[in-house]
Amino acid sequence: MNEKKDYKDTLNMPQTNFEMQAGLTRKEAQFRQRWLDNKLYHKILAKNKNNKQFVVHDGPPYANGSIHIGHALNKILKDIVVRFKSLQGFYSPFVPGWDTHGLPIENKMLSELKVNHKQIEVVKLRKEAAKYALNQMLIQKEQFLKLQMLSDFEEIYLTLDKNFEAKQLKLFKKMFFDGLIYKGLKPVYWSPSSMSALAEAEVEYYDHVSPSIYTCFTITKGNEFVEVDDELLIWTTTPWTLIANSGVAVGLDIEYSKVKFNKKNYIVASDLLEKVMEIFGVQKYKVVDTFKGKNLLGVEYQRPIKTDLFGIVVAGYHVSIDAGTGLVHMAPLFGEDDFIIGQENELDQIMHINDDGSINSEGDEFQGLFYSSANIKIKEFLEKNDKVMFFEYFTHSYPHDWRTKKPIIFRGTPQWFVSIDKIKPAILKEIEKIEGRPSWAVKRLATMIENRKTWTISRQRSWGVPIPIFYNEKNEIVNDEKVFDHVIELVEKYGSDVWFEKSVDELLPSEYKNKNWTKETNIMDVWFDSGSTSIGVEIEGVSVPFDLYLEGIDQYRGWFNSSIINSVAYWGQSPYRLLLSHGFVLDGKGKKMSKQLGNVVDPQEIIQKYGADILRLWVANCEYAHDVSVSESIIKQTVENYRKIRNTIKFLLGNLQDYDHSKFNLKLEGIHELINERLKKVKFDILQAYNDYDFNDVIKTLTNFLTDLSSFYLSISKDSLYADKINSKERRMIQYNMYNILEATLVVIAPIMPTTAEDAYDNFNKQDKQESVHLEKMFEATIADDKLEKTWKEFFDLKDEVYKEIEVEIANKKIKRTNDAHVTINTKSNFLMSLDLKKLLMIGKISFGSSLRVETFDSHKCPRCWNHIEKTEVVEDLCQRCYQTINS
């Protein structure tokens, strides 16, 4: 019995040290350390130092707790941009930052020290808060580095840094002396749970159950339209504010009805009469008279709670007939419209709510109650006086403190404000120059700025940058630049703690001491801190505006907003040229993540289990302009996509071990020329997608190309790669294409999967090889020639027809695979007849005839290359090609 000869050693089998198993969790740590040891980030900056800049400015995450999946999405997107721009040759330094002041850290310290803010010295609290914030920053820094960021995080910025704080005070000073910052009494968002004012960006809306009460105020001084003892019908969802009532607003041109029921006359807007009567359950009523709102002006009534005082009817521009009664109860310190109208009409301003939400002595018998707890007691009080027309509870969207998640109120207090109205035209003009993605980004920002009148920047807390204001002996604000400059110098030297550590005289220049001045105790809003980064952050060789701000969609009312206000105020221009936003990260079912639901996906767990490159590929695959989903199954799907890319890279590397690109001097022919043109088109499309920040399209274009490549070109190439002579023309043309494809693939994936790209690059016998793939240059776009694609369409149409027929024969078990087939083709095409169709279609035998036909090929299988040949062509059991190859 003859032994079968083993021809394996005569074949050109793939060889590479690039492993099939990625081992990302192990390799990522190794490569990260190598990059840090070799100072790769600094080498990239040095290489591009004199080139055009592209700077992504990092919006500072809050230094509290581990990073979550939203942080990972954000930082990876930024890193992809920075890496891509660096490969393009841009000088693209990335300086990460942290937001380090604010209530969450302050509350954390109070909780750990088991005290409230009144039981601890401010200086001690601040020292502990700083220590905590710095520790949290270090934790997050390590977690960010594990995302395989390009930056080495050596150069960072912190809002608690004394240099940053000093620059923030310089901004405050400029805005103050430009008349943009002022102190005033005004109702603002007030959080009883935080005992501080809030800015709009710190307010979130959740469903909340509130009381709805219809009551009436008895007229004590009428006119020709209404009489004493007639009743003004009022609707409110904040009964606790009735304590502070001092007026009722009507619409000047709204028609009102005097309607009689239950032996009394009631005043209500005519358009709301039927609805109100239906709510009250009143079926029989009589309209006694109708008149305009202007006819009610000056009418006096008995106040609902402080019954010994009277209120007055005034004109209200905000009164509508959408709901309620058309008469609006006014408590001037508990609503913006109430405040403005109250000032115009000199209405009493009553503040009966303490900082913590409890009622003070102004609340008479309700003193000591929490404001919301007083609602039911006030209802009972009104019922005793027969003043409750209707009462119920209803659920509606209501503002909450974004940190404590507790309801907030409008409350008039002395606060420091930025006047947006004064600077609004300049901001809107700058917004017109900004490019935004998605396309609605700029309009959204402009709308939010247009709708802002003021920005409350003072906070009644301890952990933050102080408002550097002194008051003289008459309690007047001191307007002296020299005083400001002296404080700024002290902060630059000692940090903002100096404001709390030193006495007033110690903070003042010598000529201002001993004047019995006092200092402001409020601190600045953290959004003023983070909004100051275009002033406070210095990057070598970089000036405002930065090229890109990239943050979550919530930052249109947050960082995007505060940054452009502060930058226009200080620099006179926008801090960014391009605005990019991403959505929120939801679970696999599209639900918001929460610990209660148990659907939180931890980026650290993904990295530990699969590797950062997998997490980064998931990010690149997301259509991030919208909300995105992540789950175990989505990550596993990403792993599969990753494997396909990795396997193709491994195949390319394995078959280039004997190829020297510098020695290639052949002209591409046939299918090889077509593949080269296809690569040009793919590179063009990928470059366009990268430049459009469409990373999903980058991955889609690359994977589609590699998939098509594997299913056709690489499949038909295996025969030549493995079985041809090493230096055969066919083999070298294939390797030329494979080299170019691999070279392009590695720079394409480098911004997205930096570890995998570097791992493959280490194993790539590349011409003019750099120390790292990340020091390579991104290819430039060239337009492909579509003439070849049109020419070759005829072949691919034929291929589809042939394979359709072959599949039928395989299903009928007449043949096992394509090279078992003898295919007869009906064609008169010179192009098709000029091709090596047997090779291109991987068919056993090709004939030309009158119709397309597939038959079994009565053949001999070459034991070396496994191709099927005519029995008459066998030479010592081999096909002629294999015989010549091993005997040459």
From Swiss-Prot:
Key words, A-Z: Aminoacyl-tRNA synthetase, ATP-binding, Cytoplasm, Ligase, Metal-binding, Nucleotide-binding, Protein biosynthesis, Zinc
One GO biological process term: isoleucyl-tRNA aminoacylation
Alphabetical list of SUPFAM superfamilies matching this protein: Anticodon-binding domain of a subclass of class I aminoacyl-tRNA synthetases (SSF47323), Nucleotidylyl transferase (SSF52374), ValRS/IleRS/LeuRS editing domain (SSF50677)
Annotated catalysed reactions: tRNA(Ile) + L-isoleucine + ATP = L-isoleucyl-tRNA(Ile) + AMP + diphosphate
This enzyme's EC code(s): 6.1.1.5
Residues the entry annotates as binding ATP: K595
Residue positions of motif 'HIGH' region: 61-71
Residues binding L-isoleucyl-5'-AMP, per UniProt: E551
Cofactor note: Binds 1 zinc ion per subunit.
Annotated motif 'KMSKS' region, positions: 592-596
Pfam families xrefs: Anticodon_1, tRNA-synt_1, zf-FPG_IleRS
EC top class named in words: ligase
Binding-site positions, Zn(2+): C862, C865, C879, C882
One example GO MF annotation: isoleucine-tRNA ligase activity
Job description of the protein: Catalyzes the attachment of isoleucine to tRNA(Ile). As IleRS can inadvertently accommodate and process structurally similar amino acids such as valine, to avoid such errors it has two additional distinct tRNA(Ile)-dependent editing activities. One activity is designated as 'pretransfer' editing and involves the hydrolysis of activated Val-AMP. The other activity is designated 'posttransfer' editing and involves deacylation of mischarged Val-tRNA(Ile).
Complex formation: Monomer.
HAMAP family given in the database record: Ile_tRNA_synth_type1 (MF_02002)
Name of the protein this chain belongs to: Isoleucine--tRNA ligase
Organism of origin: Mycoplasmopsis pulmonis (strain UAB CTIP) (Mycoplasma pulmonis)
Name of the gene: ileS
